[in-house]
Amino acid sequence: GYTDFNFGRTIFVESNGSCLTSTIDSYNIEKIDFVKIDTEGFELRILKGMTNVLTYQQPNMLIEMQDIDTYSAIYDYLKSFNYHMYWMPVATFNPNNFKKESKDVFGPRHGVINWICSIKQLNTTLQPVVDRDDTVERMNWRIRNNVGHDTEHGE
């Protein structure tokens, strides 16, 4: 099945136990330069637990965007700290994978959506996340049609 080819996996399990949590802010780390967030839909909660870090340390970040329904809220939250966001989609299948699996069970249109986030505007070939309603489809349309990010998009 699908999980036989999954090179990492997410499994949600109902539990009656408890989980201790700490916010990043609670650790009082002196300097944080870079943060990677891959939390399967809990990205906004993580960001809200690092308000002081975002305000005073302003680290660069890579955020795996799990749920398209949260893009707008995450965009708004990061913009409130003056962050710039850039699309960094990554194909799910890599023929040089650890298991040496040659079959791409995911298909050519399947991948992971990441945002690169920086206080500074980056000189990059990555496409910017242009507004709270931007999507990978809009970004791909801009690339295919060789138009700037301030041009109306097609669907």
State the predicted function of each range:
Residues Q66-I68, A91:
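Active-site beta-loop-alpha junctions enriched in small/polar residues
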Residues I74-E155:
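Binuclear metal-ion centers of metallo-dependent hydrolases, dominated by the metallo-beta-lactamase
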